[in-house]
A protein has these predicted regions:
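Anaerobic metallocofactor- and corrinoid-dependent redox/one-carbon enzyme cores
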Residues: 1-24, 31, 63-67, 94, ...
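Electropositive, gly/pro-rich neighborhoods at or near active sites that engage anionic ligands
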Residues: 3-171
Length: 498
């Protein structure tokens, strides 16, 4: 897939890309993110689309995905041998990996924005530039600027998606979300695609089927145009890595709109549906016409629980909160600033990122539990499930844990940090703010690169550092951006707060 995309990007140097060209680039990159597509057949279909578009551009016209008869035989023609990236010098491989993985994560954001009618030419152009960069023989000195440019463009991309989401669904508002599943038929929607959730809410209205979010879909409850649907009831379960246990024998249907899909177990395989770029062998896939009838019928057939089914977060809490995006937090900025000046708030932590199954991720639970009562925890992405059901109190009427949204809502955290720095007349790195990030997949890469591109320093990353980063590149990041590997909550809190 990556080799075909690099080949297409090279063609775009001599043939003007079309809107469809840009879309197929997004689709191809998005498809290769961890836990999106397990289906070799559909991967080849997308590769064929990429090669068809390449052939069409070379012939002077785009065919919008129609496959010329020679596509199968031409599949490898002019495509880059991607193994050259993995066989390169480890420092070159590391930097190209940062660019590639960063673009994959960014493509997910751009794809979601496109589904809501938003795109940005500078973002589209960078994907082609970045892909061509992967296929070129460049030095570390030549690659480093492109690594940081990936982060800069991702900030534009996150802003684009934020604008798309808030234009379509309103500015998120603080919302308490129950974790109990009410009796009766229900569908659990997971992933990140708010448009798919909206379409499902419309199609299930008045049909006696309740809708629950899962994983990164939790922040949907904060958007006014989604929360107005009375049958959007609550949130099911915890983070993605627990799905094989949490989904087993559940009498409801599951819809995956994006990652993270794990290998499906027999105990629930008959009730899992995919859509968009998500694909898994033998599962029913909802195509672009978005007729969710099979999902709805399965939910009605299963019938749901006969009595309300109590579920909790990993710490035993039965509700969580969301909706503290930049619009909400900046709306009470005067209260926050006054609380800082009065000494009621001594420090802010942004604790979030990707969750995973690796031992040691309880670090983030303990970090939040042990954080002093005069500190505020901003959080985002699925890493929040390690602690978002905790009740650690409030400061000045504001909860100490504020969920800012999905991973792409790192944009909200950046907006808040910049606004606070302006209010206090200092740089962002001089704020009483520390980032404590959990690491897993490609979306974490593009967010990390954005933080680096903005010049943010002195943050903590764990529970392990990226395995694909070479010692030399890691040393560069540590020396230039003062990135700390997490150690223990006690030691890190002491180092941060003194």
């Amino acid at each position: 897939m990556t080799g075909a995309l690099i080949g297409l990007a090279r063609v775009c140097l001599t043939a003007a890309p079309t809107a469809y060209t840009h879309r197929i680039v997004l689709e191809g990159l998005f498809t290769t993110i961890t836990n999106v597509n397990f289906n070799e057949e559909t991967m080849h279909v997308i590769i064929d689309k990429v090669n068809a578009e390449k052939a069409a551009l070379l012939s002077g016209k785009s065919v919008n995905g129609s496959l010329p008869s020679s596509t199968e035989t031409d599949r490898a023609a002019a495509n880059y041998e991607v193994q050259k990236i993995w066989q390169a010098d480890e420092d070159i491989r590391s930097l190209k990996s940062l660019i590639l993985f960063g673009m994959r994560g960014m493509a997910a954001y751009a794809y979601h924005a496109l589904m809501l009618g938003r795109s940005d030419q500078s973002v589209d152009d960078f994907f082609l530039k970045g892909l061509r960069t992967l296929g070129e023989d460049l030095t570390m000195e030549e690659l480093l600027p492109v690594v940081l440019e990936t982060g800069t463009v991702n900030l534009t991309c996150m802003e684009l998606l934020d604008r798309a989401n808030t234009t379509a669904y309103g500015t998120p508002v603080p919302t308490t979300v129950p974790l109990t599943i009410e009796k009766g038929p229900f569908i659990v929607v997971t992933g990140h695609d708010l448009k798919d959730l909206e379409l499902l809410l419309k199609q299930t209205e008045g049909k006696g089927v309740n809708i629950y979010t899962h994983g990164e879909m939790l922040p949907a409850h904060g958007y006014p145009e989604l929360k107005k649907y009375k049958h959007l009831k609550g949130n099911f379960g915890t983070a993605w890595q627990n799905q094989q246990k949490e989904f087993a024998n559940v009498p409801g249907a599951f819809l995956f709109t994006t990652n993270c899909l794990m290998p499906v177990r027999p105990s629930y395989a008959d009730r899992v549906f995919t859509t968009e770029v998500v694909s898994y062998p033998e599962l029913v896939h909802i195509d672009d016409n978005k007729d969710f009838t099979p999902v709805i019928e399965k939910a009605l057939e299963l019938g749901g629980y006969t009595e309300d089914h109590v579920m909790t977060g990993i710490n035993g809490g039965n509700t969580v909160m969301t909706g503290f995006a930049h619009g909400t937090v900046l709306g009470v900025a005067d209260k926050v600033i006054d609380a800082v000046k009065a000494g009621a708030i001594k420090h802010f932590f942004l604790v979030g990122g990707c969750d995973g199954a690796r031992p040691g991720r309880n670090y983030y639970t303990e970090f939040v539990k042990q954080s002093p009562a005069d500190t505020v925890i901003l959080t985002l992405a699925c890493g929040k499930y390690r602690f978002n059901d905790l009740d650690i109190g409030s400061i000045g009427g504001l909860p100490r844990i504020m969920d800012m949204g999905q991973c792409n809502d790192a944009y909200s955290a950046i907006k808040v940090a910049v606004a606070l720095s302006e209010a206090f007349g200092c740089g962002v790195n001089d704020l009483p703010l520390t980032l404590v990030l959990s690491w897993y997949e490609q979306k974490a890469v593009c967010i990390l690169l954005t933080l680096l591109a903005l010049g943010l320093k002195n943050f903590y990353l764990g529970p392990t550092l990226p395995a694909f980063v070479s010692p030399n590149v890691l040393n560069y990041l540590v020396e230039n951006f003062n990135i700390h590997p997490t150690s223990t909550p006690e030691a890190d809190l002491k180092a941060i707060l003194g």
